[in-house]
Each structure stands twice: as C-alpha cells, then as structure tokens.
Amino acid sequence: KDVLNLHEKLTASSNRRLTTQNFALPFKLDWSIDRITIVGFLKKFDFDHTIITEDGEIVYTAGEDFTLAQAMPILAREEGAQKAGAGWVLLDKYGENIAYVEVLPFLDKATGREKGRIDFNPNKIQHFLKINLKDFIKLMFEDPHFSRADVACDIIDLDDEYVNQYRLVDAVSFRPYYGQSGALETAYWGARSSERQVRLYNKKVERLKKKEVLPENVKFWWRLEMQLRRSRADEWVKVVHETLDSFYSPQTLPMNLSATEKIMLTGLHANHGLWNELNKDTKRKYRKLAKEVAKEDELTQHLKASFSESVEQLDKELNNWLYGMTVNRNED
C-alpha cells in the first residue's frame, strides 16, 4: 500500500534537466508537507446524559466538562487510540499509528486555559482517513495554529556524488554523518530545538536500512527537509526561500572568482571546522560569496523554480487541515 502510493507520487514529480560537463541529466523534484504539528486550546463539552460502558462503568456523568483527556480513554476502548508516554497515539482501522496527541503540561499564560497538540505525517494518512482526523481536530481544538511544519523536497535520480556535495552556508551548526564507504548519508544544519533545522539525507539508503521496498526504476533518491517550529512554521514559504538562497555546491564555481576565492570556498566546504578559525569579516565575506554561487547553481535554481510552482498546492494542503485558516505565504 505504502509503496504504491509512493510510486504514484514520484511519477507525478516535476521533471527537470541538469546540464553539467556538457551532459544533460534528467531528474525529478517533488515537494511535500512531511510533518505537521497543530496546537490549540482544548474545547470543553457537556452532554445531557451519562455515558456508561457495556460493563456498567461510568465514563462520563451528565453535565460534567468533557475534554480531550476524557475522550482518549474512550477512543482506546474502541481501539481507536493507544496510550503512549504522556499522550496518546491515534490508530487507523488497520491498527497503524496515524497521529500523536497530548494535553500540554502547562496552561496558557494569557488565559489560563488548557492546551493540546496533535502531531502527524499527512503523507501517511490515506484520503479516507483525512476526513476523520480533520473532524477530530475540529472537535477538540479551538483557535488551532501550526507549531511545526516540515517542508520536504525529494530529489530523484540525480547522482549521489552530485547531491552529497551540497551545503548550507548559514551560520548554524553542521553535523554530517557518513556511511561505511565514507560517503555522506545525512547532514543536519541547526540545532534540533531551533526554529529551523535543515536535513539533507539519502532517502534510498534510509529505506534500505529499514528494509522497506523501493519504487521501481529509482536509482538515486535524496531528500532536502526543512523542519520549521513555532513562528517559523507560519513563515514557511519565506523560510524555504531563505534556505535555498544558502544552498550551494563548489562543484561549478563561477569563472569570475579569483583563484584565492575558489581555494577558500573549496577548503571551507571540505573542512567545515575551518570556519571557526576565520574572523567575523572574513566569515561574512565568504558566506556572501557562497550565496552568490548559489544564485548561479543549476540545482538550487531548479529547487527554487519547482518550489514556486508547488507553493499553491502546499498552501492548500496546510490550509485544509485548519478549516480555512490562512497560513502566512509572505515571500518578501
């Protein structure tokens, strides 16, 4: 089921062509919303009748407040939820985990009201289940908003050795992870708790490690993922553009750069730790220079163009989960 849906997604990707060393390389780009976290005030209900189980247990008394904390055990009895840590996992009819929901451990400072959050991957929810989950969000949450949105782009059939050379030049932490062959498999930019963390990873290798079946005819498969939290989740369009402005590779440096500039960019790319040995002005100079390189980079420009083509559809998907609440699409 999962493989079938994935294959359908890949065949609907944006077809692109990269020209490098006088060769035209066909590849595909596919943008998606990979994960969503919604936070909102928890609604309270009251019913005019008492709810009693078949065993005679009273799970709700008429006139009392009915909240998320009371609803989840009832769902669990119906095999629609399962306790998981401080929260609950929502299950589909096959028993698959489709979402995680919890009551936040603190009250809203301004109102003193109880808040909750729900976290899910929209790509893993079948169409007929989306309605149920949206109904659940509408039923339980008041004034919902995004606290996290992961925007991802699958880069399909572009050679590993080409894609794994790309870096972000932003002044954030960089953590690379390499495979047994010494090739890059995953790279993180930014702290996990920060408002923006970027990950570039070999999706094909990840799926093989998990022993998951791959779609046919996919030779190479990378994913560029931007994990946006708190206020940055509402500014997702702007953040994606800012990220791509800094996404570059030293493989095709412009001819107008001096030999020293080329050596510096190549060296800083090869050994990220060297950035720490530069003074502020020199860092600023070469970060600015790397962003100029990104403006001329073919893959980066394809990513920007395909994202612009996908923004409206991604916006609709996000907006759809919040029943008409417009998310921030400012591209300035």
Where do the PLM segments sit?
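Structured, helix-rich domain cores that form ligand/interaction pockets
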Residues: 1-278, 293-332
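Helix-turn-helix DNA-binding segment
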Residues: 280-288
